[in-house]
Regions:
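Bacterial N-terminal signal peptides that target proteins for export
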Residues: 1-10
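Bacterial N-terminal signal peptides
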Residues: 9-19
């Protein structure tokens, strides 16, 4: 199937959302959550995939495990990476992705290994993100955000792994991401978006500093806890890349370093994402084990963010996939029965919730 044809009818550059849908949208209560949505990409396509689950253990990709949105139709580099999804207080769904095709030359999209000179701007250099917003997971608005244009004085070399969370104190959606300035080390920053989720409206600020300035950090993932505090999972390239944790009483700073790694891998991993099991006081940390072939996701579970239980990898333990392999850098959110049923029906997936 031609990837470009997948997108036609699903998303164009900007889709005008129905006023009646947006006006009636609200954040569901936990008792109404009945399903899970996994968003991910893979290396062969650099495109966006969706997978649904009834129980948070077994996931089935929609659209016969083909992309639901082709990277070459939505990204300036003709490929996306690192998709993240969250739900805002307005009931809308927010997806943020890295605008980067690592194999762009191989795919025939450019003549050079990277978009800009590798010696000056480093590995995987790019210019920004793809931001999307929807009230029904089917019709989306889209904006291509070039960080280097918004902040030309920063000499941005790369901007990766954007994630979105609502900052109640600022009453804005906060985008936090990995950024490298010039050919320096990657660090983690945050900035606020406009209400339409089309651009950034504040100067990027550091959200966390690793104790050793020579160690690169990336891929932050922030989870609000019931007591009002926040936990950040992130990657420290301290030896093999590993998942570490920091905690704070505020969303956009003050995170306290903890030395122990959280993942159970011998090799390198990245892309942490924490999600809560519906109706339970349990959280699952998912991460991308990129040091193995084929690539796979690993999982650990916790009730207190102090003690962690290893759940293994997809199809090696309790976590399963039914129709897809080698997912990369994903995120999971909970859905209501109505939302999951609507999405499954749209993509012709015979699954009830």
């Amino acid at each position: 199937m031609n990837l470009k044809s997948i997108v036609i009818g699903f998303v164009l550059s900007v889709f005008v959302l129905s006023a009646c849908v947006s006006s009636s949208a609200k954040t569901p209560e936990e008792k109404d959550l009945a399903a899970y949505l996994l968003v991910y990409f893979n290396d062969p396509t650099h495109s966006l995939f969706f997978a649904l689950s009834q129980d948070g253990y077994s996931f089935t990709a929609v659209n016969d495990a083909q992309p639901i949105m082709a990277g070459d139709t939505i990204a300036t580099q003709k490929g996306i990476r690192d998709p993240h999804i969250t739900r805002g207080p307005d009931g809308a769904f927010y997806i943020a992705m890295t605008d980067l095709h690592v194999f762009g030359r191989r795919a025939g999209y450019r003549d050079t290994e990277w978009e800009r000179d590798g010696e000056e701007y480093g590995w995987g250099n790019n210019r920004g993100f793809v931001l999307m917003k929807s009230f029904d997971l089917i019709n989306w608005t889209r904006s291509n955000v070039w960080i280097e244009n918004i902040y030309p004085h920063l000499n941005v070399a790369c901007a990766w792994a954007p994630q979105t969370i609502y900052d109640a104190q600022a009453d804005k959606m906060m985008l936090y991401f990995t950024m490298r300035l010039g050919n320096g080390k990657t660090k983690m920053y945050y900035a606020y978006t406009d209400d339409d989720f089309t651009t950034l409206v504040s100067e990027p600020q550091l959200i966390f500093e690793y104790p050793d300035p020579d160690i690169q950090v990336l891929d932050a993932d922030i989870t609000p806890l019931p007591d009002g505090s926040f936990v950040m999972m992130y990657v420290a390239q301290d030896g093999p890349a590993q998942i570490k944790m920091a905690k704070s009483d505020r969303i956009n700073g003050g995170y306290v370093y903890e030395p122990d790694k959280v993942d159970f891998e011998r090799g390198s991993c990245e892309a942490p994402n924490v999600w809560k099991r519906n109706g339970e006081d349990k959280w699952v940390l998912m991460y991308d084990v990129f040091s193995i072939r084929p690539h796979n996701f690993g999982f650990v579970e916790t009730t207190d963010f102090k003690n962690f239980t290893h759940l293994g990898r997809f199809n090696e333990g309790v976590m399963k996939t039914t129709n897809f392999t080698t997912p990369k850098h994903g995120a999971i959110i909970s859905l209501t029965k109505k939302e999951a049923d609507r999405l499954a029906k749209h993509w012709g997936l015979d699954m009830k919730f």
